[in-house]
């Protein structure tokens, strides 16, 4: 375990770097053929009934001039997480410097005190720190905020230096929200790491528990010849609002549950709007550019729903006021009992969409929320493009190169090399994607061949196999205490086994998640695997997976349905091969050989 005596290695290497926090260029909407907004194929709420004034009374109130807490009369039937929040304000660990004192405490002393034990297991998630009590006791995963998935070589080197210090315990993952998670962190080092993050323009604040997750945007923003709008300015505005410019924003840190937001910038819908609590869909109204809004999309163990139209449009300049209004309506009115029924869609179901919309509208600065534009700018016939490999940018003489990162896992040496490649061949920038891959933008065409010959691209290939290129996997039980099965190595193994059985004519997206929380987003995959346990033919308990089939992304988005339950992992490959033959046009290898 890293010693607190070694804190110096995490201190800011470049004190001036915080000045680089200002974000990329402005918005550019380009005219494209409009298409009508289509509601996702989710069941719509029942017809609105009158909602009582009592039900619309806010359940939280502001205390001490900053923190929002649950009112006394609503404190019955709470879930355990809400009780932890009431026991001590989680944001005080950051906003009042509590983390510095906690970091000095020995683990034995922490364990002996109920509040401090809750601090390391629950409240530190408000600072993006997740104690790996079950699998890496005393070590933490740290999740960052990386709006639009855009990061710099300087930031990447800093993160690499952090995980390098932890040896075999340290590594990093690209997440399904265009983000970094770093592993192996020890508590005594946290204050220095937070300072180091701040110096390079990063934060981990408000990235876990009942907070707004990383704002997602088009990974090709600003370089895509066919983009509708550059999403970077919007996602950076959202991130700045969410964390109040890294200072902490306690008005939205006591939500009933986590909350996801994305801004759509292309016809490809790389951002997966249908599974976000709030999705901004580009649309023009009265000749003015703005966004139609979708709300309520989510994935959870018991239920998954596609986002629904709010029947609302906002000008591009008003993305923050409406985000604030939606969040405050959810914060004020959401229920806090059964944890499986606290996502925002449950509130929409209870109130009805029109009543929910009314609550959002009255929280707008001028009390007005315009009705949706009749058409958005998404081309519903658009074929989703592959960003892996070499592709021309809108900037003449430039290309971007998409690299496949197998199941998103990256080591310190890989990160140092990625930073070097970004500097040597590009503009010092990297883009992370929701499929756990990395894009190097702004590569001069004359440098492309040299980049493709770099040794790292043997590991992070720009041209992976058709089954590997769409492979996504959550952390799994190697590090996550909630995961039922190992996922990352299992995903690679099963894919390798399947590739020996069949040949596919196109990419097939396969997602793995270690438990029903579905961090691996199996419901958006062509074929998904959700971890569980079952008995094999000998009656032995073994790792298994529920299989999902039929998820779609892009202009024809749709969530997958259950196909087969509790299949032992060792028996998955032939079943997956059958699915690929029956539904995806795959050809069995023995047939290929016969034809040759």
UniProtKB/Swiss-Prot annotation:
Binding of [4Fe-4S] cluster, residues: 474, 480, 515, 519
Compositional bias ranges of the Low complexity kind: 31-47
Keyword Iron set for record: yes
Region annotation Disordered: where it falls in the sequence: 1-56
Phosphoprotein as UniProt keyword: no
PANTHER family to which the protein is assigned, alphabetical: FERREDOXIN--NITRITE REDUCTASE, CHLOROPLASTIC
Similarity comment: Belongs to the nitrite and sulfite reductase 4Fe-4S domain family.
Full protein name: Ferredoxin--nitrite reductase, chloroplastic
Organism: Oryza sativa subsp. japonica (Rice)
């Amino acid at each position: 375990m890293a010693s607190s005596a070694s804190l110096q290695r995490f201190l800011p290497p470049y004190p001036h770097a915080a000045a680089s926090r200002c974000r990329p260029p402005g918005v550019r909407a380009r005219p494209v053929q409009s298409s009508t907004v289509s509601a996702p194929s989710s069941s719509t709420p029942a017809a609105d009934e009158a909602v009582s004034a009592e039900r619309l009374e806010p359940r939280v109130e502001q205390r001490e001039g900053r923190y929002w807490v649950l009112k006394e009369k609503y404190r019955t039937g709470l879930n355990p997480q809400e009780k932890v929040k009431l026991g001590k304000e989680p944001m005080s660990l950051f906003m009042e410097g509590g983390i510095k004192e906690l970091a000095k405490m020995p683990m034995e002393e922490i364990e002996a005190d109920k509040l401090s034990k809750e601090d390391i297991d629950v409240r530190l998630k408000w600072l993006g720190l997740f104690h790996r009590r079950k699998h890496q006791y005393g070590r933490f995963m740290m999740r960052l905020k990386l709006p639009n998935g855009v990061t710099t070589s300087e930031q990447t080197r800093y993160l690499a230096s952090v995980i390098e210090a932890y040896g075999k315990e340290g590594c990093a993952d690209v997440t399904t929200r265009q983000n970094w998670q770093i592993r192996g962190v020890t508590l005594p080092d946290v204050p220095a790491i937070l300072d180091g993050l701040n110096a390079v323009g990063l934060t981990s604040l408000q990235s876990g528990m009942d907070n707004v997750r990383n704002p997602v945007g088009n990974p090709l923003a600003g370089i895509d010849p066919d983009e509708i709008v550059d999403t970077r300015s919007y996602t950076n505005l959202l991130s700045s609002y969410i964390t109040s410019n890294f200072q902490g924003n306690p008005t939205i840190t006591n939500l009933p549950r986590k909350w996801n937001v994305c801004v759509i910038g292309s016809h490809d819908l790389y951002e997966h709007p249908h599974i976000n609590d709030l999705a901004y869909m580009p649309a023009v109204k009265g000749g003015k550019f703005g966004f139609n809004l979708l709300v309520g999309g989510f994935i959870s163990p018991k239920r998954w729903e596609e986002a629904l139209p709010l029947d609302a449009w906002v000008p591009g300049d008003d993305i923050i006021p409406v985000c604030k209004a939606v969040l405050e309506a959810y914060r004020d009115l959401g229920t806090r009992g059964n944890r499986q029924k606290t996502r925002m869609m449950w509130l929409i179901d209870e109130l009805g969409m029109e009543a929910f919309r009314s609550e959002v509208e009255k929280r707008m600065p001028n009390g007005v929320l315009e009705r949706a534009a009749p058409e958005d700018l998404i081309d519903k016939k658009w074929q989703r493009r592959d960003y892996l490999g070499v592709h021309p940018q809108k900037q003449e003489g430039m290309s971007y190169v998409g690299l496949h990162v197998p199941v998103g896992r990256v080591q310190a040496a890989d990160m140092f090399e990625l930073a070097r490649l970004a500097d040597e061949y590009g503009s010092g920038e990297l883009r992370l994607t929701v499929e756990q891959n990395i894009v190097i933008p702004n590569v001069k065409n004359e440098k492309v061949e040299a980049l493709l010959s770099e040794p790292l691209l043997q590991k992070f290939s720009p041209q992976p196999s058709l089954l590997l290129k769409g492979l996504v996997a959550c952390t799994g039980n190697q590090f996550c205490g909630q995961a039922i099965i190992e996922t990352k190595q299992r995903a690679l193994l099963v894919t390798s086994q399947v590739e020996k059985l069949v040949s596919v004519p196109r990419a097939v997206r396969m997602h793995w998640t270690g438990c029903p929380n579905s961090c691996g987003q199996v419901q958006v995959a062509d074929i998904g695997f959700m971890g569980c346990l079952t008995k094999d033919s000998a009656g032995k308990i073994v790792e298994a997976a529920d299989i999902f089939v039929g998820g779609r992304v892009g202009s024809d988005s749709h969530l997958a349905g259950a196909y087969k339950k509790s299949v032992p992992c060792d028996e998955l490959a032939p079943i997956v091969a059958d699915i690929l033959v029956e539904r995806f046009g795959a050809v069995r290898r023995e047939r290929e050989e016969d034809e040759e």
